[in-house]
Design a protein with these regions (language model features):
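N-terminal intrinsically disordered, cationic/polar leader segments
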Residues: 1-156
Length: 156
């Protein structure tokens, strides 16, 4: 039983330090960043996306290569180029039975979309649902300054 919030934080830090064999910093998060306004690719009627707009694909699924369990995410992307919306939807759906880690999924998406549309600027962020309490939200960008901040979608 803990009497103060600081005791919880101390216990978490101590356990993580021991587990990772390193010095871990931990703090309470009292406010989460808002998820960006986006245009939902799942319901988009336009043939192509518009440059420099934020688009999201809700309900992305891949398969964990270790456990064979499904991993679900929302994929956010922005590009300086127009992208074919139906191609993107088919592409994201093609991962449904693919066994890959979150980070590799986002890296592959970045490379494939960049190459398919010759994008000069592109950023993709995968907001994966937690499994085992671990928050994995990889982002890949052509820019050093990231557009997507660390935010949580309501289903994370």
């Amino acid at each position: 039983q803990f009497n103060k919030d600081s005791e919880v934080l101390d216990k978490v830090k101590k356990d993580l330090n021991k587990l990772t064999k390193s010095e871990v910093k931990a703090r309470f998060i009292t406010k989460f960043s808002e998820s960006p306004d986006c245009i939902n690719l799942n319901t988009l009627r336009a043939v192509n996306t518009k440059p420099n707009q934020v688009y999201c694909f809700i309900g992305f699924r891949s398969i964990c290569p270790v456990t064979s369990q499904p991993d679900f995410a929302n994929i956010y992307l922005t590009s300086g180029s127009a992208l074919n919306a139906s191609w993107l939807i088919k592409y994201f759906k093609s991962y449904a039975e693919r066994g890959d880690f979150h980070e590799h999924c986002v890296e592959s998406m970045f490379e494939d979309i960049r190459d398919q549309f010759q994008c000069t600027s592109l950023e993709i962020s995968g907001r994966f649902m937690r499994r085992g309490g671990i928050d994995i939200n990889p982002t890949r960008s052509s820019s050093k300054k990231l557009f997507f901040k660390n935010f949580r979608f309501f289903n994370q």
